[in-house]
Every structure is written in C-alpha cells, then in structure tokens.
Amino acid sequence: MAEETEKKYITNEDLKKHNKSGDLWIAIQGKVYNVSDWIKTHPGGDTVILNLVGQDVTDAFIAFHPGTAWHHLDHLFTGYHIRDFQVSEVSRDYRRMAAEFRKLGLFENKGHVTLYTLAFVAAMFLGVLYGVLACTSVFAHQIAAALLGLLWIQSAYIGHDSGHYVIMSNKSYNRFAQLLSGNCLTGISIAWWKWTHNAHHLACNSLDYDPDLQHIPVFAVSTKFFSSLTSRFYDRKLTFDPVARFLVSYQHFTYYPVMCFGRINLFIQTFLLLFSKREVPDRALNFAGILVFWTWFPLLVSCLPNWPERFFFVFTSFTVTALQHIQFTLNHFAADVYVGPPTGSDWFEKQAAGTIDISCRSYMDWFFGGLQFQLEHHLFPRLPRCHLRKVSPVVQELCKKHNLPYRSMSWFEANVLTINTLKTAAYQARDVANPVVKNLVWEALNTHG
C-alpha cells in the first residue's frame, strides 16, 4: 500500500523530452501534466502551449488563468512530480504578489470602465452619424472622421480587455462584446487578435516567436533580422532581401507614415486568418461580424457628397488610429529583444526586459486604455485596467529588489527612443558588406544593359 501511494518523480531533463506532437508535457508547481489531447480545446489556443511544452510553466499559468482553472488540471496529472523542482526568488515574489492581489479582490473588482467606454463609443458613433448624415460642411465631415478614428481606438480597448478577462456579467455577453467591439465596429477579427496577442504575451520580444515584432520587409528593430530569421509563429522565413534592405534602410523616415495605414494590414491579416485552413474559434460568427463592418462602413462613406470627401474621410479616420499603432510599438520596439523560444524559468524577467511603460497623468488613462502600464499588464494580463495604476509602485519595487529593468518614460521620450532604435538598424542595413538573400523580382527590375 505504501508503494502505491509513493510519489513518482522525473527530472527537468526528462520533462524536456516530452515536447513533440502527441507527447506534450508541462509542469506546474512541481506536478507534471500531459496536455497532448487537451491542447486542441485549450481556450487560449495551441500556440501558447506549444511554445512552453517540456518545461515548468507555473508563472505563465498564474498570469493567464483565474483561480477556477486549477481544478481543470486534475484530470491531466500524469502522477509524476519534478524531483529537482526549484523556484527562483523572482518567481517566488511574483507568485506572492499575485496571491496578494487575488486576496484583495482586484481581479474580480472590474470597476465601471467597460460601462463608461461602451457609453463613450455609442455617443461617438451617434456623433459620426450626425456629422456625416446631418451636416454638409467639409469641416464637419472631417470632425466626424476624426471621431470615428477615436471610436476605433476605444473600441479596440474593449476588445483587448474582453480577450484577457470577462468584462461583462457572463461569458456569453463577453463574447458578444468581443464581436461587437472587434469585428462589427472595427473590422478586425477578435479571433485574429486573440491568436496573435496571446503569442505576443507569452513570447514577449522574441524576434522569432513574437508576431508583434515581425514586420519584415517594412521594419526591423534588430540587426538579427538581417540573417533572415524563421518566424516560429507564422512558420515561414522572414527573408531579408534587397527589397527589405531598401525599406529598412529608411524605416526611421517611413515609421509614422506607415502607422497611418496600419489598419489596412490588420484588415488583411483578418481575412488571411478567416480564409485559412487553421482552426478558428467561432469562424462563422467572426465572418458575420466582419460582414457587418463592411456593410455599414462603406455605406456611411458613400453618404458623403463626392469622392474627394470620401477619400479624405477614410484617410483622416485611418490616420487618427495611427496614435494607437504608435503606442503599441512604443511599448516594445525599443525594449530588449532575444532570439529563441520563451522559457518558463525566467518568465517575469523576460516581461520586464521586453516592455516600456508610458508615463502620463491619471486623467489620460482613458486615452491609453491601460496599456501605458505595459509591464504591469504583461505581468497581470487578467487585472482590470482600473487597478494598473495602483499596482504600478508595487511592481516597480519588485523590479528594483531584483535589479530588473523598469522603464517608464513620457510619450515624447518613447517616440525618440523608438526612432533611434529604428535609425540604428536602418544605418546597419545600408552596410553593403552584409549579405542578403537575392530577390529575383527585384533583381529583374533593376537589371541594365
């Protein structure tokens, strides 16, 4: 009987071997779990688990899951424990902090941010309709366009929050809020956002695993991209050819203009995913939501009196959303980067190294949607944004205690740092001594004689 109840052990080296399809193991709090079959139904998708299999994932599990998720692990338990199980001082303090926040009820107390934002979005939508349908001046139409851009920004924050935690009274209403704020109002699939955003959170600033840094041929935040890295997220080579070299060489000049048209790329990414062979949760609902957007938006634009006004309406609305695209890049482009998969053993350290906070007064929190506290958000993605400011000093102290970076700077300083990062890579891209992969189309267009 004693033998039956005796614990079974494997080492971390043994655990690493279970990282292939059909044999996927992870460890949480020293207990080993087999997620080979369960990965197909994981609410957060398979990518995040595949990036961490064969290792301890305790910190990531704590960050992304509510307390109710722990009981789901029971039926996945292999019976094995990790013999050489150790917890670093950083992880110990992080877990203690997460437990304290949970005791204080911070994860459950969501405040009224969602209600206020939804009301604000509804008011702006009515304002846009009034400006287009009831006004005749060009100026009023441009104000409506700018208002629409601001609406898209705020609506994206609702979609972002609802993807991390339940912002409504139940999960069904939460899903409705996702589809409304993402697909119907902005034309960007919430399924696409969750697919890429979860991967970004887990592999923060990994050049080959984080999709938010993979913008070849337009941008390269590091010279490591010059060796044509393979994207482990998109499963394709990020070829640094003559076209990429040319574009990257001037990226510090093209950065802001490209941001003005960032939405077009998101539209394209949405359709690429929805028409792909990938398993897409709620594909039909995502299609329906996108159809709603591409019904009301062109119809609204068509109500303007002539084509020049229609063009400038679209241009202005897209340009306003550049503020949000810039914010996304300010949080990461100039932070530390690395090549390789994320690791569970230094999860906190990687989040601290890969993020930059934007300092602002509290009355501007609505504008940034909580993302100005980027490190706090990455450490506690389920924490409602109304609490991010109050936990910021605690996070800062923890970083100071363990000699980890805590970068917080003004909007202007972050812009300067980002441009300098792009400029540094741009100048190195111009070095003809660095070999590049030949682009046959480019070569043909530039052949003389």
From Swiss-Prot:
Motif Histidine box-3: residue span? 374-378
Residues annotated as transmembrane: 113-133, 138-158, 173-195, 255-275, 284-304, 311-331
Cytochrome b5 heme-binding domain location: 7-91
Which EC number(s) does the record attach to this protein?
1.14.19.29
Q: Where is this motif: Histidine box-1?
A: 160-164
GO:BP terms for this protein? Answer: cellular response to cold; lipid metabolic process; sphingolipid biosynthetic process
Where, per UniProt, does this protein localize? Endoplasmic reticulum membrane
Any GO CC annotation of this UniProt entry: endoplasmic reticulum membrane
InterPro entries registered for this protein in UniProt: Cyt_B5-like_heme/steroid-bd, Cyt_B5-like_heme/steroid_sf, FA_desaturase_dom, Fatty_acid_desaturase
Q: In which tissues is it expressed?
A: Highly expressed in flowers. Expressed in roots, leaves, stems and siliques.
Cofactors: Fe cation
Following inactivation of the gene, the phenotype reported is: No visible phenotype under normal growth conditions, but mutant plants have strongly reduced levels of unsaturated LCB sphingolipids in all organs and show enhanced sensitivity to prolonged low-temperature exposure.
* GO molecular function term, any single one: sphingolipid 8-(E/Z)-desaturase activity
Read off the Pfam families from this record: Cyt-b5 (PF00173), FA_desaturase (PF00487)
Keyword terms, alphabetized: Electron transport, Endoplasmic reticulum, Heme, Iron, Lipid metabolism, Membrane, Metal-binding, Oxidoreductase, Sphingolipid metabolism, Transmembrane, Transmembrane helix, Transport
Membrane topology qualifier: Multi-pass membrane protein
The record's listing under SMART domains reads:
Cyt-b5
Motif: Histidine box-2; annotated at 197-201
**In which residues is heme bound?**
H42, H65
Q: Which reaction does it catalyse?
A: an N-acyl-(4R)-4-hydroxysphinganine + 2 Fe(II)-[cytochrome b5] + O2 + 2 H(+) = a (4R,8E)-4-hydroxysphingenine ceramide + 2 Fe(III)-[cytochrome b5] + 2 H2O; an N-acyl-(4R)-4-hydroxysphinganine + 2 Fe(II)-[cytochrome b5] + O2 + 2 H(+) = a (4R,8Z)-4-hydroxysphing-8-enine ceramide + 2 Fe(III)-[cytochrome b5] + 2 H2O
Give the range the annotation lists for the signal sequence.
Answer: none
What job does this protein perform?
Plays a major role as delta(8)-fatty-acid desaturase which introduces a double bond at the 8-position in the long-chain base (LCB) of ceramides with or without a hydroxy group at the 4-position. The enzyme produces both the 8E and 8Z isomers (in a 4:1 ratio). This structural modification contributes to the quantitative partitioning of ceramides between the two major sphingolipid classes, glucosylceramides and glycosylinositolphosphoryl ceramides.
Q: What is known of its domains?
A: The histidine box domains may contain the active site and/or be involved in metal ion binding.
Q: Which family does it belong to?
A: Belongs to the fatty acid desaturase type 1 family.
The protein here is known as Delta(8)-fatty-acid desaturase 1
The major lineage groups are: Eukaryota, Viridiplantae, Streptophyta, Embryophyta, Tracheophyta
